[in-house]
């Protein structure tokens, strides 16, 4: 597996297209546990978006976004659940270039190494933030695109298997609660 050490900035480009005509109504947030979610879910059905969303940034499928002040808790995600949406202007948005498989980068963002690297690059004393430049300066070991795809697919398969097992465990727990309730009425 041929690898080379490069920097994330060699493989991504910042996006900042705005919702100028307010045509996109799907306001999204990035959660550290669920990735992109509709803002109404993040804030329990409260409307926190501005009435004027013309300055909000447009994100499309496979684009990434993060809140610079919340990345230290894992609030960075790739859009996979919607075709497009808009995020607050404070978010930093970017996409991968053709030489980086988005899923590979997505899994890298879940790694301990990534969190160690962002800790080195946070700026500010009270509210520590990661700039786009700070993200771009993080080293990244890049195999060929074909190997990236293989790694991404394998990790996705494992994630699906884990989800199935979790779902099965929840089913067994519900059955147990039901039986306990029936037995000890």
Where are these regions (language model features)?
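Non-catalytic DNA-recognition/assembly elements of restriction-modification systems
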Residues: 1-21, 137, 141, 145-146
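Amphipathic alpha-helical coiled-coil/heptad-repeat segments
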Residues: 1-6, 142-185
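Sequence-specific dsDNA recognition surfaces
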Residues: 9-20, 28-61, 87
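A short beta-sheet element
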Residues: 54-112
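A short glycine-rich beta-alpha junction/loop motif
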Residues: 69, 85-90, 123-146
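Periplasmic-binding protein-like
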Residues: 114-117
């Amino acid at each position: 597996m041929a690898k080379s050490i490069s920097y994330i900035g060699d493989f991504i480009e910042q996006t900042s297209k705005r919702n100028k005509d307010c045509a996109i109504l799907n306001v999204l947030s990035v959660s550290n546990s669920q990735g992109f979610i509709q803002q109404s879910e993040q804030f329990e059905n409260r409307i926190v978006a501005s009435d004027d969303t013309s300055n909000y940034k447009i994100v499309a499928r496979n684009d990434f976004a993060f809140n610079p002040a919340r990345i230290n808790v894992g609030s960075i995600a790739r859009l996979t659940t919607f075709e497009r949406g808009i995020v607050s202007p404070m978010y930093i948005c970017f996409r991968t270039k053709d030489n980086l498989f988005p899923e590979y980068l997505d899994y890298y963002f879940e790694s301990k190494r990534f969190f160690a690297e962002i800790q080195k690059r946070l700026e500010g004393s009270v509210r520590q933030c990661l700039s786009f430049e700070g993200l771009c300066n993080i080293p990244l070991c890049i195999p060929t695109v074909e190997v990236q795809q293989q790694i991404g697919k394998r990790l996705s398969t494992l994630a699906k298997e884990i989800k199935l097992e979790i779902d099965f465990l929840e089913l067994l727990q519900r059955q147990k609660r039901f039986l306990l309730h029936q037995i000890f009425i």
